[in-house]
């Protein structure tokens, strides 16, 4: 929880509240995080600077998120735009990747005559209605396509779960 919060610009006060810890401990967590991962801080600053210069940031697929308030004189308004400058490339790229995976999965199902259906996408998760006799093949296709949707320096890792409802599948 702290990892995402820090990347998305959580304050010392916000982290202390979220983790139910004293503020000085939250400050130590945030400071320690950036000491351990200085590249994250560099990324955050570079993203804000690019946004200030261009007025937008991009995903790894080239989609743009325009940030008209990035140079606002109002610190609150500007801060919101700065957080979006940091978050949009990450979350937008994740959205791009899952859409690529969905297209590949759909095409594989069609090509292989799979009758099971993709029924829902929620953030980085896909839900399917799977015929029992297709369970292993569907799982194999989905994991392959989720993990191969986009090549990066770090591997994309996917997992799967099955159940008669969403809760069971987790």
Residue ranges: model-predicted function:
Residues 1-170:
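Conserved catalytic core of nucleotide polymerization and phosphodiester-bond processing enzymes
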């Amino acid at each position: 929880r702290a990892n995402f919060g820090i990347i998305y610009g959580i304050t010392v006060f916000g982290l202390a509240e979220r983790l139910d810890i004293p503020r000085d401990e939250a400050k130590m967590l945030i400071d320690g995080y950036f000491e351990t991962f200085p590249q994250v801080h560099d990324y955050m600053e570079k993203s804000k600077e690019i946004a200030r210069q261009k007025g937008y940031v991009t995903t790894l697929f080239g989609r743009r998120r325009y940030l008209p308030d990035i140079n606002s004189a109002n610190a609150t308004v500007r801060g919101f735009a700065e957080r979006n400058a940091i978050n949009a490339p990450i979350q937008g790229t994740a959205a791009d990747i899952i859409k690529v995976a969905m297209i590949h999965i759909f095409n594989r199902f069609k090509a292989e005559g799979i009758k099971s259906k993709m029924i829902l996408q929620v953030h980085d998760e896909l839900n399917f209605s799977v015929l029992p006799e297709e369970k292993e093949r569907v799982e194999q296709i989905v994991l392959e396509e989720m993990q191969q949707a986009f090549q990066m320096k770090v591997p994309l890792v996917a997992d799967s779960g099955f159940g008669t409802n969403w809760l069971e599948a987790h």
